Amino acid sequence: VVLSILKNIFTYQKYLLNYNSEVYIFSELNEKSLALANSLYAKNPKRLIVFNDTFEKNEEETYELIEKAKKLNSICFKQDITTVNFNVHNKKKKILFFLIGHDDTENIEQCVTLLDTYKNRDNTHIYIFSNSLESEFMLSSCDKGKIKLRRINDTETLIFRNLYNEGYRLFENAVPIENVKKITAVIVGMGNYGQEMIKALSWFCQMDGYKSYIYSFDRKINAEVEFKSLCPELLDDEHNGNFEDDGESQYSLNIFSGYDVNDESFDEKILSINDASYILVALGNDELNIKTAYKLRRLYEKKGLHPQIQTVVYNNKKKKAIINATNFKGQKLDVEIIGDLESSYSEDVILESDIETLALERHKKWGDEESFWNYEYNYRSSIASVIHRKMKILCKMPGIDKPVDKRSEQEKSVLRKLEHRRWNAYMRAEGYSYSEIRDDLAKVHNCLVTFDDLSEKDKLKDDD
């Protein structure tokens, strides 16, 4: 016991000796926090890295993590992040807290405590990693004081960044049919990543000259029913599969429930989608994801087809082992890996996101910075808008490269109509439905109508 107390005293003394450093404090030492800490340290070794809750619950499991943490010259406290006094620090220097534990409830409880403890301190940031609705509501309603609070939904962040960086290929690989190009995307697995991608593709693929068809598979027999509960209007007959109204979102979304990737019925069904140009495999398990992705590559290769295939692989070592994998003939298996720790938990993605910077600039056209960070609705909507604007530019939409006041009336009309189509799909993917009045708690909105039914004032809001 005495040795443990002395160890804690020496650890805290080390913290005090770094009084003038920027401090990056993690609630836990785990694979995610270590990946982000490695990225921070690589950019600037003078930064002080602090891990909490590092006592050896299982020495064999934690030994490797602790050894890696030591290489960052980090400080490791055994106590919970809320019990260590980090206030004894230069007030001009930033303190950044990362609530990144595996227990979502604990992350939220720690966030509430830290907000109360440090709300009067300048230069203080809290990043809470959570996908739950509870944390979203807390972020919007709690007293933050002087603290800049950010919720990181790592599932949404991965899907949005993937579309921002690589999504243009969906348009490049679209198949010409008659006077348009057809985008055919297949999602295998409807867990968090699969659902997020389905919702995102519904608005992302809205583009003049293109038609989008989205197919998804899941082993659960009620997968379609569950998804329809999340996004009722996205799947209803009035909007799903309707390509006639150029002022409304246009897409076809089909969900195949009760299909196991290990069954022959799955093979037959997915191969009936002849013109698949994009496939995402997200089954919640690295090994199964890799196995299924390679299986699909083999099945489509037999048909002489070579769609873009991506799969989610969490483990960095597995990613490095398979990213350039070939068969015995030297043929590349050509499966793209997303979602690995190294690229998902990095400074560029979490702290210095270029997408966030552009989204904030966009939001400031009609709101202040505080409302961007404080309200998830504003944050997500602006991020989605930035992503789609990039695609409009890459697809060379007439007038998109000009300021609004320099566009012709025809260019303004076309771009406004397209932006409204995207917005309609985005809002329905967020779970909104039409109502004569707007009520965000009920997730209903009066502007969820075809473009021509908008007031002239509301049409101007669609300037992109």
Region locations from a protein language model:
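Mixed-charge, polar/low-complexity N-terminal
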Residues: 4-7, 433-434, 439-440
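Amphipathic alpha-helical binding modules
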Residues: 441-464
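Active-site-adjacent bridging/hinge elements
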Residues: 362-368, 437-446
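Cytosolic regulatory regions of ion transport systems
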Residues: 1, 5-417, 421, 426, ...
